[in-house]
Amino acid sequence: MSQYLVAIYRSDDYDPSVETEAMMEEIHALNREMIAAGARKLACGLSPAGNAKSLRKQPDGKLLVTDGPYTETKEHIGGFWILEAADLDEALAWARKGAIACRAPVEVREILFRPAPTQEPGGSK
């Protein structure tokens, strides 16, 4: 089984408070369906992109911390799922349901690297 990121995109000026009760129930129902199928590993909603902080290493080795997202675009990731699926087609089937429930575009990407279960963060054992 492979794991996939399903990223939900929102406009730069998206206000999470406008989400309707019906939309939230559809998202909760989809999450329950994903859990029952053993597909959902993690689900998260993110604060608006304007709340982000970005860090960039400078030529002198110091880190520059700036307000706002790393890239300046009209859409940003507003939330995501980490799913386990047999293949890309299965991940896309879940992503279709996510796009409908969230009423937003989604992007699907396979996760290429996962630490081994015994591996500590940072790569040491």
Task: Name what the model sees in each region.
Residues M1-K125:
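Conserved, structured core segments of small domains
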